[in-house]
Amino acid sequence: MKVIASSLRKGNVVEKDGRLYVILSAENIHPGKGTPVTQLDMRRITDGVKVSERYRTTEQVERAFVEDREHTFLYKDGEGSHFMNPESYEQVAVPDDVIGDQAAYLQEGMAVMLSLHNGVPLAIELPQRVTLEIVETEPVTKGQTASSSYKPAVLSNGVRTLVPPHITTGTRVVIMTADGSYVERAKD
């Protein structure tokens, strides 16, 4: 679908020279003299190369149709991580490079949003928070309740994070998937 360059926003996917690019930033520049331009910083989806392009604001750009669908995580194997569409029961294998560091937070039965272009997965969005168990941490030290210091801990998925001093091994905690930071003790 052709759109004018000034209408493109961060997160849109465009097609250029037969390749797909995701827009990292889009800025409309209006110089005092001359025609206004749209500056796009993009990342090529196939290999992650960052590209910067300038278009006249009225220039037509091919915007790729990307479909966001909810999928359920099933399992991981040599092909990648496998997800199922809960409506059609169709399964999709997503390569590890699409998931990236977020793979550590995938749990069986977890609902995620997959961005698909012609049935090919481009990106994945995990829930903001996940509940995990602490498998290793330092013992509780009495008298540290007044300070706001944090201690290192290892989660059940192998990720290291910092937790408050009162958290012990075996405690279930809520973690942010974006940065792996501690949110709160799980309420279950």
From Swiss-Prot:
- Pathway recorded for this protein: Protein biosynthesis; polypeptide chain elongation
Alphabetized GO MF terms: translation elongation factor activity
InterPro entries membership: Elong-fact-P_C (IPR015365), NA-bd_OB-fold (IPR012340), Rib_uL2_dom2 (IPR014722), Transl_elong_fac_P/YeiP (IPR020599), Transl_elong_KOW-like (IPR013185), Transl_elong_P/YeiP_cen (IPR001059), Transl_elong_P/YeiP_CS (IPR013852), Transl_elongation_fac_P (IPR011768)
- One Pfam family named in its UniProt record: Elong-fact-P_C
- Extract the Gene3D superfamilies matched here: 2.30.30.30, Nucleic acid-binding proteins
List, alphabetically, the CDD domains matched: S1_EF-P_repeat_1, S1_EF-P_repeat_2
Can you cite a GO biological process for this protein?
peptide biosynthetic process
Keywords for the protein's UniProt record, in alphabetical order = Cytoplasm, Elongation factor, Protein biosynthesis
Where does this protein reside within or beyond the cell? Cytoplasm
GO cellular component, as recorded = cytoplasm
> What does this protein's UniProt record list under function?
Involved in peptide bond synthesis. Stimulates efficient translation and peptide-bond synthesis on native or reconstituted 70S ribosomes in vitro. Probably functions indirectly by altering the affinity of the ribosome for aminoacyl-tRNA, thus increasing their reactivity as acceptors for peptidyl transferase.
Family recorded in the similarity comment: Belongs to the elongation factor P family.
- Protein name, per record: Elongation factor P
